[in-house]
């Protein structure tokens, strides 16, 4: 096989066994990689109803066939597990260099199962694998963990995926971190890692990924890189200003969520934009492995020195959504969130929920610990610099916040003020300004998520062509489905979603076929994406998903018209789109997958 080693590493932390398992090309052609591999093993080997923190939960680190190649952005890997935040599938994607190094070590994926009886890390040096004691780094921040483990193994070139104190303390939105500030962020994958007493995976590889036709592959790759460099977003806005280039764009279009999505316009948006960040704090760009885009940023603050980020989502989550406009405070808060290993979207969403509950009188000052605790008021930067530490350590009211926004709102009888889907906090786009994006939120397999069907591309940015953000026709619903299936392919290939700024579906077909020696059509790859999407949906259904109750949006978006800006007066007409989405997916009227659809997709073994 080209693009794969055909090897999976299985590590059982309960009994210490380490096994090599193999797969063939038929398996690869069915599941492709990353989240495809992950959902297969979750469905095959695990009861979807188990407690996410039980030793029986699998924690899977998986690469794609283009991971570790020179394909543009070919350094991605994913962490797949059952989410402690949503209770459904979690598949978190990260860049940096860890994924490529895992591939260089000769492994396509790692399946971690069981639970160690003390803190450990997994050390991988090509085919040599050990479970080692991690007591010395337990409790350490992410940067310190990486430094100490590199010293311990005596190799500064190893790549490390680790958790910080938030993961150790099972904060439900803890992340898996690599290269300091790269995050497999969403769904609480870091909390599952912490529940297994697994502090880190340390990898060193010396192999190179083989492709079917090196000459043809490089010809294709050069063509795709040139397309990306000529694109105004992938070759212009992102390398110049990072993902925070979106701040002004989204705010001008009136869907930049402000004060827990109470409105879509933030009057201080420019002060926290990518342009402002570049002018005041930027030191240099920092691209991930094989990335011609280079959206990563290294910024400098006197209080903390050099740090990476924040990205667009983090800038918003720790800024406008909390009514905070001080960019230095946002950068510092993002830095500590990364060091503790926390998803910034859920962190910000949880704090925003607390702020609205507090301002509406549902959370009292005595609930949070008395007069000495900083009050949860919108615009209060002290909240950032106090509660982030408390959440990561689960101290005081931070222990309640560590459960996430849904459980917080439920505890204080204010669920209508939780802005999330399937218990996961929503990201930085108010769906009242992009209704197809709202349908994507409601139907997303991992809950509140933008990146698995980035409808902001057609509805706001005009990729692959401009669509009216308030059109809810069948064409719009079909586009949501196409984006969901195509994103599954891009993820499974081991590439970054930002390549869709400049590349179309056929471009991914070209790269995959040249690398793998396959003769698949774009429709063949989209069928793999559809299979992955439906398999993840099936896992959720088996885990207890009630579609008609949970494929929905907060009441604010369905019943409260946007109060100001370009989208003033608009709500999301989800009830008009959802039945057509189910029908076009080939599902039942109540959102379930019929037997004939499962058979069509080759999923009958999981029926």
From Swiss-Prot:
Broad enzyme group: oxidoreductase
EC number: 1.2.7.5
Binding site residues for tungstopterin: 76, 93, 95, 182-183, 185-186, 338, 343, 446, 452, 491, 495, 497
Cofactor binding annotation: Binds 1 [4Fe-4S] cluster per subunit. Binds 1 tungstopterin cofactor per subunit.
GO molecular function terms listed in the Swiss-Prot or TrEMBL record: 4 iron, 4 sulfur cluster binding; aldehyde ferredoxin oxidoreductase activity; electron transfer activity; metal ion binding
Needed co-factor(s): [4Fe-4S] cluster; tungstopterin
Keywords in alphabetical order: 4Fe-4S, Iron, Iron-sulfur, Metal-binding, Oxidoreductase, Tungsten
Gene3D superfamilies listed in its UniProt record: Aldehyde Ferredoxin Oxidoreductase Protein, subunit A, domain 2 (1.10.569.10), Aldehyde Ferredoxin Oxidoreductase Protein, subunit A, domain 3 (1.10.599.10), Aldehyde ferredoxin oxidoreductase, N-terminal domain (3.60.9.10)
Reactions catalysed according to its record: an aldehyde + 2 oxidized [2Fe-2S]-[ferredoxin] + H2O = a carboxylate + 2 reduced [2Fe-2S]-[ferredoxin] + 3 H(+)
InterPro entries per UniProt: Ald_Fedxn_OxRdtase_dom2, Ald_Fedxn_OxRdtase_dom3, Ald_Fedxn_OxRdtase_N, Ald_Fedxn_OxRdtase_N_sf, OxRdtase_Ald_Fedxn_C, Tungsten_al_ferr_oxy-like_C, W-dependent_AOR
Binding annotation for [4Fe-4S] cluster: 288, 291, 295, 496
Subunit note: Homodimer.
Family assignment from sequence similarity: Belongs to the AOR/FOR family.
Entry-linked PANTHER family: ALDEHYDE FERREDOXIN OXIDOREDUCTASE, TUNGSTEN-CONTAINING ALDEHYDE FERREDOXIN OXIDOREDUCTASE
Protein's recorded name: Tungsten-containing aldehyde ferredoxin oxidoreductase
Organism: Pyrococcus horikoshii (strain ATCC 700860 / DSM 12428 / JCM 9974 / NBRC 100139 / OT-3)
Taxonomic lineage of the native organism: Archaea, Methanobacteriati, Methanobacteriota, Thermococci, Thermococcales
């Amino acid at each position: 096989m080209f693009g794969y080693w055909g090897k999976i590493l299985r590590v059982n932390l309960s009994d210490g066994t380490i096994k090599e398992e193999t797969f063939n090309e038929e398996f690869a052609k069915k599941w492709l990689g990353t989240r495809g591999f992950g959902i297969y093993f979750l469905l095959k080997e695990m009861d979807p109803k188990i407690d996410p923190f039980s030793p029986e939960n699998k924690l899977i680190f998986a690469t794609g066939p283009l991971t570790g190649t020179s394909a543009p952005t070919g350094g991605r890997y994913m962490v797949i597990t059952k989410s402690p935040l949503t209770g459904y599938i979690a598949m978190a994607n990260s860049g940096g260099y860890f994924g490529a190094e895992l591939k260089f070590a000769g492994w396509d994926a790692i399946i971690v199962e069981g639970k160690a009886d003390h803190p450990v890390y997994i050390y991988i040096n090509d085919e040599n694998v050990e479970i080692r004691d991690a007591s010395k780094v337990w409790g350490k921040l992410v940067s310190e963990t990486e430094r100490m483990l590199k010293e311990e193994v005596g190799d500064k070139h190893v790549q490390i995926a680790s958790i910080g104190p938030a993961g150790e303390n099972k904060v439900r939105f803890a992340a898996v971190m690599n290269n300091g500030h790269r995050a497999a962020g969403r769904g609480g994958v870091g909390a599952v890692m912490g529940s297994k007493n697994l502090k880190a995976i340390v990898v060193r590889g010396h192999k190179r990924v083989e492709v079917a036709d090196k000459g043809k592959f490089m010809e294709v790759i050069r063509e795709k890189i040139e397309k990306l460099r000529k694109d105004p977003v992938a070759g212009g806005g992102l390398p110049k200003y990072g993902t925070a280039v979106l701040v002004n764009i989204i705010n001008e279009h009136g869907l930049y969520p402000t004060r827990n999505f109470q409105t879509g316009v933030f009057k201080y948006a420019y002060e926290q934009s990518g342009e402002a960040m570049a002018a005041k704090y930027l030191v240099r760009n920092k691209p991930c492995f094989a990335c011609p885009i280079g959206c990563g940023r290294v910024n400098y603050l006197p209080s903390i020195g050099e740090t990476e980020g924040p990205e667009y989502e983090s800038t918003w989550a720790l800024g406008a959504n909390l009514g905070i406009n001080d960019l230095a405070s946002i950068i510092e808060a993002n830095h500590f969130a990364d060091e503790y290993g926390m998803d910034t979207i859920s962190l910000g969403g949880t704090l925003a929920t607390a702020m609205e509950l507090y301002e509406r009188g549902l959370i009292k000052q005595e609930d949070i610990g008395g007069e000495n605790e900083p009050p949860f008021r919108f615009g209060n930067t002290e909240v950032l610099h106090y509660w982030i530490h408390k959440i990561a350590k689960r101290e005081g009211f931070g222990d309640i916040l560590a459960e996430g926004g849904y459980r917080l709102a439920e505890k204080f009888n204010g669920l209508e003020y939780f802005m999330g889907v399937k218990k996961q906090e929503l990201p930085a786009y108010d769906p009242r300004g992009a209704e197809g994006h709202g349908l994507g939120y409601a139907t997303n397999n991992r809950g509140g998520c933008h990146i698995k069907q980035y409808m902001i591309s057609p509805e706001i940015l005009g990729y692959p062509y401009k669509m009216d953000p308030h059109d809810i026709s069948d064409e719009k619903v079909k586009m949501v489905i196409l984006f969901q299936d195509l994103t599954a392919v891009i993820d499974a290939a081991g590439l970054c979603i930002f390549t869709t700024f400049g590349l179309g579906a056929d471009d991914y077909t070209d790269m995959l076929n040249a690398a793998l020696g396959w003769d698949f059509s774009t429709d063949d790859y989209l069928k793999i994406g559809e299979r992955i999407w439906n398999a993840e949906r099936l896992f959720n259904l088996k885990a207890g998903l009630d579609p008609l109750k949970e494929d929905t949006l907060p009441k604010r978006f369905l019943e409260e018209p946007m109060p100001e800006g370009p989208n003033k007066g608009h709500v999301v007409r989800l009830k008009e789109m959802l039945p057509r989405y189910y029908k076009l997916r080939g599902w039942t009227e109540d959102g379930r997958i019929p037997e004939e659809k499962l058979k069509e997709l080759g999923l009958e073994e999981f029926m």
